[in-house]
Design a protein with these regions (language model features):
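S-adenosylmethionine
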Residues: 1-225
Length: 225
């Protein structure tokens, strides 16, 4: 991070933030309750030691629960996800714990049977979370204007397997005709990507104040539409 960025983050103790961004990110997943019975899975012993094999998911060494996510689990080690049949079967989704916080924000909202619009949905992590919350009587419209990213979104939705998600590729303004039809509208708008700093070293070099301003303008446009 630049000196200017550290200054801008002084309220959050810029030096500590920089150190956190340099640290190895924890590995977390969100279990698919329709395929795993997530509520019955162990969250790891009190000592924080991993559970080598957890309720039919042998590739996952579960270290503990994500506090704000019913189905979220931290892993003690990062497995080879691409070699795990359970990953490809949609038994879980690899998702940062911070991204799972949206489920906590919806705890006071009646989501069972709800109609939910995920306006900027790819790659689908939050979409699958909404699908689990909405249940079989609900509907999630997962929208992504980029067709390449929408293809990835559709693949992840198919793997999750809840059968209550429709993938669309509309401009936000096209969905404006459905005013007051959705019970929940979620907008994970395009952002400047600081959250990628820990995972992708190239992300730091691609960051710029110009990109931040461009993203802010796009966010404002999406909300107005």
């Amino acid at each position: 991070m630049s000196r200017g960025q550290t200054r801008d983050f002084r309220f959050f103790k810029g030096a500590a933030l920089c150190a956190a961004l340099d640290a190895e990110p924890p590995v977390s997943v969100r279990l698919n309750p329709a395929k795993t019975g997530a509520d019955t899975l162990p969250a790891g012993p009190d000592a924080g030691l991993p559970v080598p094999e957890a309720a039919g998911l042998p590739a996952l060494a579960i270290a503990g629960r994500v506090p704000w996510s019913r189905d979220g689990r931290y892993l003690a080690v990062r497995p080879s996800f691409t070699l795990d049949p359970d990953f490809h079967a949609g038994a879980y989704y690899v998702q940062e714990a911070s991204s799972q916080f949206v489920g906590h924000l919806l705890e006071g909202v009646r989501t069972e049977g709800a109609r939910i619009l995920d306006l900027c949905a790819a790659p689908g992590g939050k979409t699958t979370l909404y699908a689990s919350l909405a249940g079989p009587d609900g509907l999630v419209v997962a929208n992504e204007i980029d067709r390449r990213r929408a293809s990835v979104l559709a693949d992840n939705v198919r793997k999750w397997g809840t059968g209550n998600v429709a993938v669309t590729t509309c401009e936000p303004r096209a969905l404006g005709d459905f005013e007051a039809w959705f019970d929940v509208v979620a907008v994970d708008a395009p952002c400047s990507g600081e959250g990628m700093f820990r995972k992708d070293p190239d992300a730091r070099g691609e960051w710029s104040e110009g990109n931040v301003k461009q993203c802010a303008a796009r966010q404002d446009e999406i909300l107005r539409e």
